[in-house]
Each structure stands twice: as structure tokens, then as C-alpha cells.
């Protein structure tokens, strides 16, 4: 395992935000092998939202061929980081068997829980706290919760978008 963490923006938006999914990146410890991955929830989320809440995110799985051979002094592998994400090719819901080498990196992000209640009813202070902790991105704060963040995020660093 090269990396594992909770994944931002994977819990469904809601007055009560859904729990976060996780992400993991791994490689094999032998020179080469055939890998087989089977998942459910890649195209349609399994965890629905309730009472106006949004569903949790769908599963994402990808493969970066020869990633470690060309990684150089890159920081730790984290598939959702913009700098490294371009190297990962999506595998789709049922890729079948595929070859892997010890230089390849397989990454998967699994879904979080569904949200409960209208996301616009979530307390803006809670949304700001979610952004500060890396649970929700600034983009999701604005598009899902209607909370527009200022450049500096502080306990009072929010403003509702004009549409709410």
C-alpha cells in the first residue's frame, strides 16, 4: 500500500453530510502479475441520500502504468491530487484481468454515505469546518451547499451565495 486516506467530496451533501469514502493506492511486490478487479457502485452510487440529501460518490478505479519508474522525487502517491491524477487512466466498471508490474500503481476511491436533508440547510459554519478539515472542497462548498468562501477560511469566513 502506497497511500490510504479518507477521500474529500465522497460523502453525499446534506444538512447532515454523509460519511467520507476512502482512497487507496497500491502496487505489487513482485515483478509482474495479472490483476482482477470487480466492483459494484462504479456507475451508480449505492448509498442514496434521504429527505433531499445527495447520494455518496461513486467508486473510481484507475491504473497508472510505470508510474513509479518515472515518479522521481514526486510526493506520496495520492490519486485525487491534480498533479498526479493525469497519470491515472480510468479502468471502468468491469475491466477484466489486466497485467501489472511493480512500477504500476492501482488506485481506488470508494463511495461514502448519502447525505440527509437539504444541503442548503447545513450550517455554513459546519461547511467551513468541513473545508478546513479537507472533508469538502471549496468547489463543493459553493456548488452543493451554496457557501462561498473568502480567500482566507476562518470560522466566520463565509458568505451564502446570492441564490440562497
List each model region and its residues.
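Glycine/proline-enriched, intrinsically flexible loops and inter-domain linkers
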Residues: 1-164
